[in-house]
């Protein structure tokens, strides 16, 4: 297929190179080199390496951005010490421009260069194509261009007959349409075809002929899932994604592996619609540039990334405190902004004990799509610093902290572990060590950050229950139901309840909130039969049931996690056990559809 830009690309390359030389002419010069000479086909992985000459002494950091020629640049990785980037164009062919900016962090000297790179179609004639990727359970399906006003999706069928459809993509008659196929069993034969939705009455869906392909073998060492109680035959959300503290794994509800993630992330925080994932990556404790949040695609390739050191540059410019690391939460918000949790460390004197005490709090950070910090909220500004962690947790004793640097031990004061946006545009923040859920005035980015209410023992709500200890404690993954913003779902680890009453099981809770009168009424208080001392998740499923993950269970067989489906009466309908602890688990319709 002829490239729609024709010879323009060669002219643009000359102009681009000339511009780059002008930008870098002052002294420091950056050179960008690809691992493969262009052109390459859609989906081919290219490793870009930056070299710098003429720089004064000092550490050099690099920022990578890319764009399809004629469009705006999209951030891939913000400034960091990494001078290489694995990149591909997986959507369509064309001329792409890779940009790198280099800066000397000591002298502030900068250099910038760009490289024009041609990606060609995988289509020969008018026939679709199916090709493997670097991941044995991910394939690239390429379809010929389709007409304006139409859209396309791909359907693939497993050996036993299960069908999966990708999300639709909008057609552009200039370009082929390409899809990552994910959610595939290893060593299995599949059939696949694409479907064009023309939007015309009577002939809307037009399928292509089938292609056949066979998946690869598993090569990674993965954790396993074992069925404890089998689910019913007809059940919603048939994919289980387990966020291990290591390689994440997706299985069916029988434990059959259908995907696994990269090894360069510490844990997944959220799957995103369309088949991408957000994760936290914990690096060297003494290097904030290695403390990262990363969005990656089906093959594990980085789509978007920043790090604590780069964010601290922005926070300093705004007069905010520094962060030490990201933890527990990063997710895309409605409207495309990105929210993350990070640790803040301060020495407080005669506040949480006699003399100077190192105290760890949290910061909520909101980024725009280009990773610019646009809003922050700091527990040291808005919460009572004299209210210590409910069970007196310190970092050395509990060993659950991100890196800290100001003392040999620190009070793990808040230990935030989830953040979600409410229907009216505020934030719901979970503080494990305060045993509170806190509603923050975010107001879709226009809020001043004041605390609207605190839900939990000794907070702002009464609990309408006769239970001997109705309140959740050390809770995880609190979120409001999408269909009913007055119903709150959470996983109640129950640490404080267990410390107060003796041995207790963790619970899956659904609470009806009357925010006007500050009353919480239990709708579901399910005893899950195990005690999870940490970790956990909570989710409402499409069929109206709930999924709870007891992520940190200690027993004679070693650490494990239990993912359970529970009905509205608290009955456990199905249960599957992982042979490792899981930070969170997600019941998904498929790997493109989180719920």
Kindly label every feature range from the protein language model:
Residues 62-68, 154-158:
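Conserved aromatic beta-strand anchor motif in extracellular beta-sandwich/beta-rich domains
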Residues 56-62:
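Solvent-exposed loop segments of extracellular immunoglobulin-like
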Residues 49-55, 142-146:
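Acidic, Ser/Thr
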Residues 121-140, 145-156, 178, 185, ...:
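Histidine-/acidic-rich catalytic cores in large beta-rich domains
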Residues 75-82, 168-174:
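Short beta-strand segments within Ig-like beta-sandwich modules, predominantly Fibronectin type-III
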Residues 88-95, 181-189:
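Surface-exposed, short loops/turns at beta-strand junctions within beta-sandwich domains
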Residues 38-44, 129-133:
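Short, solvent-exposed loop/linker segments at the N-terminal edge
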């Amino acid at each position: 297929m002829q490239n729609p830009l024709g010879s323009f690309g060669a002219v643009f390359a000359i102009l681009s190179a000339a511009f780059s030389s002008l930008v870098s002419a002052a002294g420091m010069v950056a050179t960008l080199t690809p691992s493969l000479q262009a052109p390459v086909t859609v989906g081919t992985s290219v490793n870009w390496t930056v070299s710098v000459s003429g720089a004064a002494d000092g550490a050099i950091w690099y920022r990578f951005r890319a764009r399809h020629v004629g469009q705006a640049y999209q951030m891939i990785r913000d400034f960091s010490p990494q001078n290489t980037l694995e990149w591909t164009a997986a959507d369509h062919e064309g001329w792409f421009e890779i940009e790198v900016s280099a800066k000397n962090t000591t002298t502030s000297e900068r250099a910038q260069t760009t490289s024009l790179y041609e990606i060609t179609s995988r289509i020969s004639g008018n026939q679709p194509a199916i090709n493997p990727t670097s991941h044995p359970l991910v394939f690239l399906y390429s379809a010929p261009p389709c007409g304006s006003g139409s859209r396309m999706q791909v359907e693939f069928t497993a050996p036993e007959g299960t069908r999966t459809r990708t999300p639709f993509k909008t057609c552009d008659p200039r370009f082929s349409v390409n899809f990552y196929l994910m959610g595939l069993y290893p060593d299995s034969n599949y059939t696949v075809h694409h479907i064009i939705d023309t939007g015309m009455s009577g002939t809307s869906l037009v399928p292509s002929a089938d292609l056949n392909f066979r998946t690869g073998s598993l090569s990674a060492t993965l954790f396993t899932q074992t069925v404890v109680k089998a689910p019913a035959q007809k059940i919603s959300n048939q994919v289980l994604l387990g966020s291990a503290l290591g390689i994440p794994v997706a299985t069916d509800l029988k434990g059959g592996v259908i995907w696994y993630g990269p090894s360069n992330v510490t844990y997944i925080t959220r799957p995103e619609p369309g088949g991408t994932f957000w994760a936290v990556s914990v690096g060297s404790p003494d290097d904030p540039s290695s403390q990262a949040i990363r969005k990656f695609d089906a093959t594990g390739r980085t789509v978007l990334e920043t790090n604590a050191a780069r964010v601290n540059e922005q926070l300093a410019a705004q007069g905010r405190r520094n962060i030490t690391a990201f933890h527990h939460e990063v997710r895309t918000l409605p409207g495309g902004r990105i929210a993350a949790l990070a640790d803040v460390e301060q020495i407080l004197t005669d506040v949480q004990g006699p003399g100077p005490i190192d105290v760890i709090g949290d910061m909520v950070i909101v980024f725009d799509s280009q990773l610019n910090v646009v809003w922050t909220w700091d527990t040291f500004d808005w919460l009572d610093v004299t209210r210590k962690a409910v069970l007196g947790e310190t970092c050395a004793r509990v060993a659950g902290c991100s890196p800290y640097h100001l003392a040999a031990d620190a009070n793990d004061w808040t230990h935030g572990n989830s953040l979600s946006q409410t229907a009216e545009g505020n934030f719901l923040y979970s503080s494990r060590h305060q045993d509170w859920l806190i509603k923050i005035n975010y107001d879709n980015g226009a809020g001043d950050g004041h605390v609207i209410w605190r839900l939990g023992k000794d907070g702002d709500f009464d609990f309408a229950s006769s239970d001997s200890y109705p309140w959740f404690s050390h809770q995880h993954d609190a979120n409001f139901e999408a269909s009913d913003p007055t119903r709150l779902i959470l996983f109640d680890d129950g640490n404080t309840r267990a410390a107060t009453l003796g041995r207790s099981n963790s619970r899956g809770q659904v609470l009806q909130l009357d925010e006007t009168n500050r009353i919480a009424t239990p709708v579901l208080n399910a005893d899950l039969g195990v005690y999870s001392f940490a970790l956990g998740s909570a989710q409402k499923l499409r069929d109206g049931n709930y999924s709870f993950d007891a992520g940190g269970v200690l027993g004679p067989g070693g650490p494990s996690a239990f993912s359970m489906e529970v009905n509205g009466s608290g009955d456990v309908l199905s249960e599957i056990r992982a042979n490792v602890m899981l930070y969170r688990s997600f019941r998904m319709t498929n790997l493109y559809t989180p719920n």
